[in-house]
Structures are given as structure tokens and as C-alpha cells.
């Protein structure tokens, strides 16, 4: 071992092998060799291993809350079912209601474009109204048919979507059929719904 004069600078061990470390020190840049401690060897090996086999990144999980009981796509190709509220609006009871007054008026997907002009011209009037499936003007879901059930009586009707609404907002006559003439008394109810065929609402196949 070589002796050094003067005070030592802080030394940094550099392991050349599991048992020998070099220590840089002194003014004349001499090199002092000393055995590595067992801890130094273990730490050195552990650090090298961590660079060779890094731990995989943690995966993040996201939770999407359900809204209105719907865990479904509203695309026309997807099957839709769930639970929403249903109310009524007497304007849909008017057979002379012009379809220019509803969301599903004209446009490529509009009901006027398909040959209908008034609420009464629709094949299953008065079982018509607004539905959550209609996102806005020219929606692909204009004219979409739903089977709507009131669990209290286990009674169902088929409803044609002609307007935009939260849940379903149908003709009073339609709600009376569903509730055994209790629409005026109940005002709003919870219903279940599912996709139905266009023919269920009277449209041609």
C-alpha cells in the first residue's frame, strides 16, 4: 500500500472486481487499492441489475360512471337497453303537428325526407315522442323504435323517436296506454327499454 502526504480529498470507490476497489486521493493523483466491503459489492451488483431489468411501469386504471343507467353505445348499429325516466307532452298528441317542429325534421336522416309530414302520418301514432337516442338534428337515430316497459304493471308499448329528450317524452295517450290511464296522475315514471325493429313501430321492412 502506498502512503500519501497531506489531507485526503473525498474518495469515490470504483470496483474493478468483486473484491478490489480503487480510491482516488492525494495531490499527486496516486491510487490506493483497498478491498470492497460485502455491502459495496451487493449494492454495485443490485444497481447494475436494476438497469438491465427495470421494473415495468405501473398500469393506471380508470373508472367511468354510468349515466342514466346506460352503459351502452348510442350508435344506430349497437343494441341499446337500460332504464330511464318517461314523461309526457300533449303536443305529441296532435296528429296535425308538423314534423318541421321536431328535431327529426329533414336532413338525410330526417322523417320528412322519408316521406312523413305530420305526427299523424307516422305509422304508430300516438306512440311517438322525444328520446335520449336522438342527439340532435339529422341524428342517425331519428325514427328509431324502442320497446318501453313500465315494471309496475309489466306493460309495454313501442315508441318511435322523433325528437330530442332526456329519457323519453311521449304523447299523453302513449303514457296512458302504458300506465292504464294514469299519465295525468303520475306525470313521470321510471321505465326500462330495449331496441326494437322498425317493423315493431309500423315501418316497412
From Swiss-Prot:
Keyword Secreted assigned: yes
A Pfam family reported for this protein in Swiss-Prot or TrEMBL: Cerato-platanin
Inducing stimuli: Expression is up-regulated in presence of human keratinocytes.
Alphabetized Gene3D superfamilies for the sequence: RlpA-like domain
GO cellular component terms listed in the entry, alphabetical order: extracellular region
Primary localization: secreted
Superkingdom of the source species: Eukaryota
Subcellular location: Secreted
Alphabetically ordered keywords of this record: Allergen, Secreted
InterPro entries: Cerato-platanin, RlpA-like_sf
Family per record: Belongs to the cerato-platanin family.
Protein name per the record: Allergen Asp f 15 homolog
Protein species of origin: Arthroderma benhamiae (strain ATCC MYA-4681 / CBS 112371) (Trichophyton mentagrophytes)
Amino acid at each position: 500500500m502506498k502512503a500519501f502526504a497531506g489531507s485526503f480529498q473525498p474518495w469515490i470507490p470504483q470496483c474493478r472486481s468483486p473484491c478490489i476497489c480503487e480510491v482516488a486521493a492525494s495531490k499527486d493523483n496516486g491510487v490506493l487499492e483497498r478491498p470492497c466491503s460485502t455491502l459495496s459489492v451487493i449494492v454495485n451488483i443490485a444497481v447494475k441489475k436494476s438497469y438491465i431489468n427495470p421494473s415495468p411501469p405501473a398500469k393506471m386504471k380508470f373508472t367511468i360512471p354510468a349515466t342514466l343507467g346506460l352503459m351502452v353505445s348510442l350508435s344506430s348499429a349497437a343494441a341499446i337497453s337500460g332504464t330511464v325516466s318517461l314523461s309526457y307532452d300533449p303536443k305529441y298528441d296532435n296528429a296535425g303537428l308538423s314534423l318541421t317542429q321536431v328535431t327529426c325534421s329533414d336532413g338525410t336522416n330526417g322523417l320528412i325526407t322519408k316521406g312523413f309530414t305530420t305526427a299523424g302520418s307516422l305509422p304508430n301514432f300516438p306512440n311517438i315522442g322525444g328520446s335520449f337516442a336522438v342527439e340532435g338534428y339529422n341524428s342517425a337515430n331519428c325514427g328509431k323504435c324502442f320497446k318501453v316497459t313500465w315494471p309496475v304493471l309489466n306493460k309495454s308499448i313501442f315508441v318511435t323517436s322523433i325528437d330530442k329528450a332526456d329519457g323519453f317524452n311521449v304523447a299523453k295517450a302513449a303514457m296512458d296506454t302504458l300506465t292504464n290511464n294514469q299519465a295525468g296522475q303520475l306525470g313521470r315514471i321510471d321505465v326500462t327499454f330495449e331496441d326494437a325493429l322498425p317493423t315493431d313501430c309500423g315501418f316497412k321492412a
